[in-house]
């Protein structure tokens, strides 16, 4: 028996284990504990297979982009679902099917833009939905119906602008609704929510956060401060309803339907239950009143009609009516056919005069509404509604049972309703339990049960009190609460959470006291105190008003000058900053008081706000109008000049200028501010930034550049708005494309638009008279290089053009904007289609000669030369987000994705934003005398001047300097082990944050002279190298010239760094790109040419220099000192973007630099152009689809209006191809030419960047003939048009120039790398082609002692007469010349553009000059020896004679003094040492000579014990080792 019992126990255990095997199944990459499955950062792209008993599922921080239908099938026990911080963009209908037990769902921090209407259906237990930080722009009707337990709905920081009417009205248990952070229009959708909240007696227990963005009168107003008077909403109601009608065939009939409602309802008509299609029935028309007019009725018009009126508040249906058309067979009282009977029965109302319908068929009861479980607050002040309604025949009876006992009649706490529902009044502890509703008739019964649960919410003990506070006075709000557990207290002001302690607002005593030290106007509003614990929350409110204390009134809106035409009505606005009792408003016209009560009322009218209306103006009504505000403490006034003109004097659009400008400024600034908020707002409660956001941040224009671009956008938008107003106001019939803005606006008003927008605030002409500076150094912003044209090559100026652009409207509209427009008889192909067909490649062939450093130097150089400012907003002027729309709406310029794209299937486009235009180009050129095409802004200086190291504006450059000492250094950041100085981190106020994944890294962005420094780690390493090189040079110059101040050291080091970059570019890098033939085209340097404009050409920046994309490897190799991979391995290109931490923590700059100089670049072949890392994976985590660099290059050329490939071939004296076979000489691949023909149709249609990269490379170069020509043209200008080019005589002395020509990037790596000991002599050529690697000591560098300044008092010796780096004061401290003064005498520009004539060459006198210098030094040395001997004699005599004798000896004539015997020493090296001379033969020994005897003392070093892992170091010029400081 015992054995049998043991066997049974063993069998039970086995069964238990067998049952548990299935339940403990855990997906790969996840952790499972009991019934919780956590798959955090498991790199999932879909929902894995899960155990069916899972209750909590955590899928955070994965890559799930879409949820299909039934994604969680079989998980009926799941209660909590975490899907936040994924990449969710789409939820298919039914994605959450089967989750009947779900209580909490987290969908926040994703990319959702819409939700299926039934996504949350059949979830009766759902308590909380978290949807914040998505892109949801619309909520479908009924989305939140049938969620009886939902108490928290969090949707802040989305894109909502409208709320559905009654969208939240069925959430009877809702306690918290957050909609803040959405630009919501407080219209009727908000009204329905407000009305439901206002009528709820428990509204004190419901927290709703919402701030109005529109209409303007409600802007920034919180939800709780809204009132009934703020809304204009009413449901539709019939004034005249339709009636039955009878008409003869061919006659006209009108079915009346007049409706009222706010907003005005839309009318539709139904015919036989189908919506009436008026476009298909020309004889039918809906009149403005809403009535239906049928002009010529026939038998097909017979049937049942119904009028439907809809607005935001709901829909209203009329009773169905019948129309009978008499053709002889259809009298009104004849029986209707079966189909009409059915239609009539469907409409649900008996028809007057029609055959009576049969009684309804008997049916058992079925529910139309049934009760749902609810959680009720204990001691709440409201009621609870349990719905119960049923239909059937006979009509069912409704009965209620509470905890099994029938409720026969209403009680003080339970109220039975006539419709069958039950209301719980003042719920208490006895109200908890089970409530059953039963519907019964003679054919059966049905029942439904609901559970009422009670929770004790926090109880407010002390509530804040509403107060009226005087301006500047302190006040305190107290709010204390009790509960179990003890609640916490939060505060809100006007619906916005208070951030905590600020300088003028303090939260004290665990947030129970809110203290404001000095009340200001922004402190006025509704304060909400919320006490919350795990059971829920309770809120109370108090209103604080801030009164102005005994001060004169202030004007919030002042009148402005205006021009009006005769016969119109003008409005002059005038409004106080706040209403107050006793405020008097008066107007005067040319000093005469205007009183509408005394003068003609039909002439003048003063509104309640204070505005003056002057009606039917005439010429005498012109003049100065003054508005005056007066109270008991003083007055305020403002005036405006009104000019009245006859109608013939004005252009049609003049009257709309200020209105259109105000609209434009608001639209542009809103788009810019939204973009700024998206890019730079505090991310403490948001997901870390993704690649695309970082790209936008680092390319986003700085303040000065942003203002320049903003002015152009406002100008352009103003003109568009003026045209809109003229069209609407004057009903002009002129076609849009025929508009000329000169016809719409007078010249005076064109200038007014320019002035308002800021386009007239052109850059002031720079002051170039400080030749002590400009003759030696570059300005930071590039001005004053060419003294005849000071802005040539300067930052924030327009690009230069080689050929006129081909904008579609002639001056601004990009190529391809108008769909279907033909070029050379063919449409422009999609840039994406061109990329996938001709450019992208997965295959990579290594180059046989050049290193990957060629690519990296090219990118670094490009960031010194050009940066086309992107649009200052990523939203269109009409509020469309370019990332989420495929609409062509400025500045959005998306790339169309063709059908059957190999990768992009879920989007129609790839988002691209246009480059900003400079004022005076495109549409903004209209206020000049001639229309100029749109031109883009170059944010950088055009010169090769190391602006990517130092910045492009004076303010930016100052931020990068270390101004704490006079050493001329650039700022450095924190120190990392075994690495030299790193770049400084970006300041918090810069809004830059590179921490994409806080588990992966917490490092901030670095900052340098170009804002794109963090784009990829190779570029970041290059910036770090040159920052270190500047500081190395500045420190060495400080040792050589200790009397130089910090500015001189900074400018001299900057000048040397810029010269090194010029030499490396022109002598070592460029020959490998353009080949020997290209260098012959460049020619030898013949000196500076002041007539040559060095500004960057648009074609160079947009097309030619982008050849470098074709030589990029998909991998960045990282090698150690032995040129083997580092332990962290190589780096895939797409992982190198915005990852500064990899530079600091994965080996520093050395491994990347070794990889660049040791690994070959990618070889460009006809079928291998751009690797797919750039066309298919670029910033794939940042956009709805990953970007495509090739497609963007093509689209950018079209945005800039680039002419076709053939235009530039002609410009470069290449053959102009008539067909694609004519290109065989440059594009040898017949397959490539055939694909080009299929895509473009004609060579004229080919995009210039594409044509350029597809050409075969010239011999010895990396570009084809076209790009060779364009590169030569630009680099020649950069060399010959630069007055401070390093080879221009006078820029450096001959000796210094010799040193600059020894500059070598390999030597720079040796000097400032962390641990470089061997490099190649030319880092751009593979080691095997130059004899392998060399030791660093074998690489020649620059000898900085040739910069030693030996002269004093501004009179240096002859050796430095050709170069005088004298110290100078800061430019900001110098007196600046007023350009308006004519009496200033300034040297002519020609004298400064030539080599400095006052400096002469003394090469022939070099030897004699040196001999004279040595002779003068010898004389000075003899004098010093003589004085020293006298001092020795005096000291020696003092040792043996009395002091008196010493005095006497000193007073005796020199010829009577006897000379003592000379004392000296000879050291171990044979050097003669004077008596008492002290010297150090080495760093540890000090010796002295005393009376012929050498005495030496050697320093002894003690034992050094360092922490584990730290080795003792002996610094230079030190004797003993010590432990280095570890940070």
UniProtKB/Swiss-Prot annotation:
| Catalytic residues (UniProt) | 863
Name of the protein: Peroxidasin
Any S-S bridges, and between which cysteines? 257-307, 388-437, 479-529, 574-627, 768-784, 882-892, 886-909, 994-1005, 1212-1269, 1310-1336
What residue stretches are annotated with the Ig-like C2-type domain? Answer: 236-322, 365-453, 458-545, 553-643
Which Gene Ontology cellular component annotation is one that this UniProt entry carries? extracellular matrix
- Specify the VWFC domain's residue ranges: 1463-1524
Chain positions of site Transition state stabilizer: 1012
> Repeats (LRR): which ranges?
51-74, 75-98, 99-122, 124-146, 147-170, 172-196
Q: Which PROSITE patterns match?
A: IG_LIKE, PEROXIDASE_3, VWFC_1, VWFC_2
Q: Which organism is it from?
A: Drosophila melanogaster
Name the encoding gene, please.
Pxn
Task: Using the record, list the residue span of the signal peptide; answer none if the entry has no such feature.
Answer: 1-23
């Amino acid at each position: 028996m015992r054995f049998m019992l043991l066997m049974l126990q063993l069998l039970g255990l086995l069964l238990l284990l067998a049952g548990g095997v299935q339940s403990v199944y855990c997906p790969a990459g996840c952790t499972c504990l009991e019934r919780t499955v956590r798959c955090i950062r498991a790199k999932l792209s879909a929902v894995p297979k899960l155990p069916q008993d899972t209750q909590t599922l955590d899928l955070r921080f994965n890559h799930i982009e879409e949820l299909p239908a039934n994604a969680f099938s079989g998980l009926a026990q799941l209660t909590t679902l975490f899907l936040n911080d994924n990449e969710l963009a789409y939820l298919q209908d039914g994605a959450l099917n089967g989750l009947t037990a779900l209580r909490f769902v987290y969908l926040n921090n994703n990319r959702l833009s819409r939700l299926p209407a039934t996504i949350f259906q059949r979830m009766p237990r759902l308590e909380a939905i978290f949807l914040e930080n998505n892109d949801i722009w619309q909520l479908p009707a009924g989305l939140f119906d049938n969620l009886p337990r939902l108490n928290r709905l969090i949707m802040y920081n989305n894109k909502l602008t409208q709320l559905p009417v009654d969208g939240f009205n069925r959430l009877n248990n809702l306690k918290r609704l957050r909609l803040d952070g959405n630009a919501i229009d407080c219209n009727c959708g908000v009204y329905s929510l407000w009305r439901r909240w206002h009528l709820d007696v428990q509204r004190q227990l419901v927290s709703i956060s919402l701030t109005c963005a529109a209409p303007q009168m409600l802007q920034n107003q919180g939800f709780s401060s809204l009132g009934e008077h703020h809304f204009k909403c009413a449901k539709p109601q019939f004034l005249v309803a339709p009636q039955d009608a009878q008409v003869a065939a061919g006659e006209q009939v009108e079915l009346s339907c007049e409706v009222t409602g706010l907003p005005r309802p839309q009318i539709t008509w139904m015919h036989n239950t189908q919506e009436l299609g008026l476009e298909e029935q020309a004889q039918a028309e809906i009149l403005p009143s809403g009535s239906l007019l049928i002009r010529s009725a026939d038998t097909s018009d017979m049937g049942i009609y119904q009028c439907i009126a809809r607005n935001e508040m709901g829909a209203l249906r009329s009773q169905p009516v019948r129309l009978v058309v008499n053709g002889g067979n259809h009298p009104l009282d004849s029986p209707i056919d079966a189909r009409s009977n059915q239609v009539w029965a469907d409409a649900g109302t008996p028809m007057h005069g029609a055959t009576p319908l049969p009684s309804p068929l008997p049916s058992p009861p079925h529910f139309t509404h049934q009760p749902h479980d609810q959680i009720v607050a204990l001691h709440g002040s409201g009621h609870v509604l349990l719905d119960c309604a049923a239909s059937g025949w006979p009509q069912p009876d409704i009965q209620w049972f509470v905890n099994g006992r029938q409720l026969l009649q209403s009680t003080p706490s339970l109220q039975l309703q006539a419709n069958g529902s039950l209301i719980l009044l003042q719920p208490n502890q006895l109200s908890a339990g089970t409530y059953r509703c039963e519907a019964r008739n003679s054919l059966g019964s049905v029942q439904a049960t609901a559970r009422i649960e009670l929770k004790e919410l926090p109880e407010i003990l002390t509530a804040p009190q509403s107060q009226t506070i005087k301006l500047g006075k302190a006040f305190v709000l107290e709010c204390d609460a009790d509960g179990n557990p003890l609640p916490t207290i939060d505060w809100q002001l006007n619906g916005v959470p208070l951030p905590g302690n600020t300088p003028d607002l303090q939260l004290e005593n665990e947030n129970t006291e809110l203290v404001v030290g000095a009340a200001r106007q922004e402190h006025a509003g509704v304060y909400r105190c919320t006490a919350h614990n795990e059971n829920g929350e309770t809120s109370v409110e108090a209103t604080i008003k801030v009164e102005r204390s005994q001060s004169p009134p202030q004007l919030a809106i002042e009148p402005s000058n205006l021009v009006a035409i005769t016969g119109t009505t003008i409005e002059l606005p005038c409004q106080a900053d706040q209403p107050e009792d006793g405020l008097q408003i008066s107007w005067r016209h040319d000093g005469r008081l205007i009183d509408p009560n005394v003068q003609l009322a039909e002439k003048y009218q003063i509104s309640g706000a204070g505005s003056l209306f002057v009606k039917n103006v005439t010429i005498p009504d012109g003049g100065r109008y003054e508005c005056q505000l007066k109270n008991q403490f003083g007055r305020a006034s403002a005036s405006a000049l009104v000019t009245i003109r006859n109608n013939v004097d004005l252009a049609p659009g003049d009257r709309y200028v200020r209105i259109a400008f105000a609209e434009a400024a608001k639209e542009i600034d809103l788009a810019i501010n939204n973009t700024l908020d998206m890019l730079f707002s505090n991310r403490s409660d948001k997901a870390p930034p993704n690649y695309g956001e970082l790209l936008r941040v680092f390319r986003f224009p700085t303040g000065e550049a942003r203002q320049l671009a903003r002015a152009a956008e406002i100008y352009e938008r103003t003109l568009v708005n003026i045209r809109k107003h003229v069209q609407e106001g004057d009903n002009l019939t002129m076609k849009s494309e025929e508009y000329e803005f000169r016809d719409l606006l007078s010249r005076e008003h064109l200038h007014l638009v320019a002035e308002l927008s800021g386009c007239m605030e052109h850059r002031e002409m720079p002051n170039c008279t400080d030749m002590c500076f400009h003759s030696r150094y570059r300005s930071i912003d590039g001005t004053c290089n060419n003294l005849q044209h000071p802005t040539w090559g300067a930052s924030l100026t327009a690009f230069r053009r080689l050929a006129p652009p081909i904008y579609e409207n002639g001056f601004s509209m990009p190529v391809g904007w108008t769909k279907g427009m033909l070029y050379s008889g063919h449409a422009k192909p999609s840039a994406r289609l061109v990329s996938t067909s001709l450019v992208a490649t997965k295959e990579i062939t290594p180059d046989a000669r050049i290193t990957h450093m060629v690519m990296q130097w090219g990118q670094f150089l490009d960031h010194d030369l050009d940066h086309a400012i992107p649009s200052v907003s990523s939203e269109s002027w009409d509020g469309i987000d370019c990332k989420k729309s495929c609409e062509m709406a400025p500045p959005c310029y998306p790339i169309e994705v063709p059908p059957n794209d190999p990768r992009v299937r879920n989007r129609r486009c790839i988002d691209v934003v246009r480059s900003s235009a400079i004022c005076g180009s495109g549409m903004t050129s209209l206020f000049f005398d001639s229309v100029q095409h749109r031109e883009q802004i170059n944010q950088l200086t055009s010169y090769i001047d190391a602006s990517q190291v130092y910045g492009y504006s004076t303010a930016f450059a100052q931020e990068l300097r270390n101004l704490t000492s006079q050493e001329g250094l650039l700022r450095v950041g924190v120190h990392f082990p075994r690495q030299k100085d790193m770049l400084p981190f970006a300041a918090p106020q810069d809004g830059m944050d590179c921490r994409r994944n806080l588990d992966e890294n917490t490092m901030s962005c670095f900052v340098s002279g170009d804002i794109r420094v963090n784009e990829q780690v190779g570029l970041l390493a290059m910036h770090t190298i040159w920052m270190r090189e500047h500081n190395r040079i500045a420190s060495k110059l400080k040792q050589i010239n200790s009397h130089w101040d910090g500015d001189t050291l900074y400018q001299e080091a900057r000048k040397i760094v810029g010269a090194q970059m010029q030499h490396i570019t022109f002598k070592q890098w460029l020959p490998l790109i353009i080949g020997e033939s290209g260098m012959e085209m460049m020619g030898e340097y013949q000196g500076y040419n002041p007539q040559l404009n060095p500004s960057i050409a648009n074609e160079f920046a947009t097309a030619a220099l982008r050849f470098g994309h074709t030589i990029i490897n998909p991998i960045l190799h990282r090698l150690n000192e032995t040129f083997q991979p580092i332990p962290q391995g190589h780096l895939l290109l797409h992982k190198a973007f915005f990852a500064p931490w990899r530079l600091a923590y994965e080996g520093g700059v050395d491994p990347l630099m070794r990889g660049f100089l040791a690994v070959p670049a990618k070889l460009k072949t006809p079928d291998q152009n751009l690797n797919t890392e750039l066309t298919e994976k670029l910033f794939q985590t940042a956009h709805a689809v990953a970007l495509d660099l090739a497609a963007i290059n093509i689209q950018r050329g079209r945005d800039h209006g680039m002419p076709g490939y053939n235009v530039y071939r002609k410009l470069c004296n290449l053959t102009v191809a008539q067909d694609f076979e004519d290109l065989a000489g440059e594009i040898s691949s017949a397959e490539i030419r055939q694909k080009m023909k299929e895509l473009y149709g004609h060579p004229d249609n080919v995009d210039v960047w594409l044509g350029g990269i597809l050409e075969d490379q010239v011999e010895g170069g990396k570009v084809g003939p076209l790009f060779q020509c364009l590169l030569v043209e630009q680099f020649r200008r950069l060399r010959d048009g630069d007055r401070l080019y390093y080879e221009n005589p006078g820029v450096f002395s001959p000796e210094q120039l010799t040193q600059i020509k020894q500059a070598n990037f390999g030597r720079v790596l040796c000097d400032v790398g962390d641990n470089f000991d061997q490099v190649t002599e030319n880092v751009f050529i593979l080691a095997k082609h130059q004899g392998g690697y060399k030791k660093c000591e074998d690489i020649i560098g620059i000898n900085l002692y040739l910069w030693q300044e030996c002269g004093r008092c501004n009179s240096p010796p002859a050796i430095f007469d050709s170069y005088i780096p004298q110290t100078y004061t800061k430019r900001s401290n110098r007196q600046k010349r007023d350009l308006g003064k004519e009496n200033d005498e300034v040297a002519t520009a020609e004298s400064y553009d030539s080599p400095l004539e006052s400096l002469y060459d003394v090469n022939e006198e070099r030897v004699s000059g040196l001999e004279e210098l040595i002779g003068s030094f010898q004389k000075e040395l003899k004098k010093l020896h003589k004085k020293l001997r006298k001092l020795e004699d005096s000291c020696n005599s003092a040792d043996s004679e009395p002091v008196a004798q010493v005095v006497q000896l000193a007073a005796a004539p020199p010829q009577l003094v006897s000379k003592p015997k000379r004392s000296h020493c000879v050291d171990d090296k044979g050097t003669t040492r004077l008596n008492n001379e002290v010297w150090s033969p080495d760093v540890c020994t000090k010796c002295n000579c005393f009376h012929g005897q050498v005495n030496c003392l050697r320093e002894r070093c003690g034992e050094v014990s360092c922490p584990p892992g730290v080795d003792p170091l002996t610094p230079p010029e030190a004797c003993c080792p010590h432990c280095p400081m570890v940070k």
